[in-house]
């Protein structure tokens, strides 16, 4: 999906520059951008937006109605303008990538990286903070940790930080032993 990422990059960069230039909190902008991306990921909405008989104003109204139904606050003016631009250009399908790239820009500015910790078993907060401290030392930067359970790992953890992977799972060790024995 490099093509979608290429299409999304200018939108993310422009929105990031606009939010920082206008004094808007980029964290709140990332939050409403995530909400818009979640709405845009709905297949029904994509189908409706792709219908040539449906106008851009109708698609925009649908987004705002979904936000109201979810008891969310009204979109800030900047968010509304951004959404109108995305809809007018027929780029609803890249909102998820725009949100990801916007977060990457925000993380880069703040010296953070997103990290996903895959664990075979649920992790309590004490274990997660211990793992987080070790990972921050290992990767040399602050990390925003997200935990996902993956029973296929058998034991241990697998950490993904950007394009770097640290795999200390039992599954990975078994695969290494299998490769060594069959070589």
Swiss-Prot record:
GO terms for molecular function: proton-transporting ATP synthase activity, rotational mechanism. Its main location: membrane. Keywords: ATP synthesis, Cell inner membrane, Cell membrane, CF(1), Hydrogen ion transport, Ion transport, Membrane, Transport. GO terms for cellular component: plasma membrane; proton-transporting ATP synthase complex. The keyword Transport applies. It is a peripheral membrane protein. It is found in: Cell inner membrane. InterPro entries: ATP_synth_OSCP/delta_N_sf, ATPase_OSCP/dsu. It comes from the Bacteria. F-type ATPases have 2 components, F(1) - the catalytic core - and F(0) - the membrane proton channel. F(1) has five subunits: alpha(3), beta(3), gamma(1), delta(1), epsilon(1). F(0) has three main subunits: a(1), b(2) and c(10-14). The alpha and beta chains form an alternating ring which encloses part of the gamma chain. F(1) is attached to F(0) by a central stalk formed by the gamma and epsilon chains, while a peripheral stalk is formed by the delta and b chains. Belongs to the ATPase delta chain family. PANTHER family: ATP SYNTHASE DELTA CHAIN. NCBIfam families: ATP_synt_delta, PRK05758.2-2. F(1)F(0) ATP synthase produces ATP from ADP in the presence of a proton or sodium gradient. F-type ATPases consist of two structural domains, F(1) containing the extramembraneous catalytic core and F(0) containing the membrane proton channel, linked together by a central stalk and a peripheral stalk. During catalysis, ATP synthesis in the catalytic domain of F(1) is coupled via a rotary mechanism of the central stalk subunits to proton translocation. This is ATP synthase subunit delta.
């Amino acid at each position: 999906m490099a093509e979608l990422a290429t299409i999304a990059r200018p939108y993310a960069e422009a929105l990031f520059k606009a939010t920082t230039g206008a004094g808007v909190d980029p964290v709140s902008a990332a939050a409403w951008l995530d909400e818009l991306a979640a709405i845009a990921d709905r297949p029904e909405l994509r189908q409706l937006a792709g219908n040539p008989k449906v106008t851009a104003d109708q698609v925009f109204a649908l987004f705002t109605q979904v936000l109201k139904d979810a008891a969310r606050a009204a979109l800030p003016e900047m968010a509304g303008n951004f959404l109108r631009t995305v809809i007018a250009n027929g780029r609803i399908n890249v909102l998820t990538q725009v949100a990801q790239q916007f977060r990457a820009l925000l993380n880069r500015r703040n010296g953070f990286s997103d990290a996903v910790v895959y664990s075979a078993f649920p992790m309590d907060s004490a274990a997660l903070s211990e793992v987080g401290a070790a990972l921050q030392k290992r990767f040399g930067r602050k990390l925003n940790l997200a935990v996902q359970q993956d029973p296929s790992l058998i034991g241990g953890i697998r950490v993904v930080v950007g394009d770097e992977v640290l795999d200390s799972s039992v599954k990975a060790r078994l695969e290494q032993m299998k490769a060594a024995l069959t070589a």
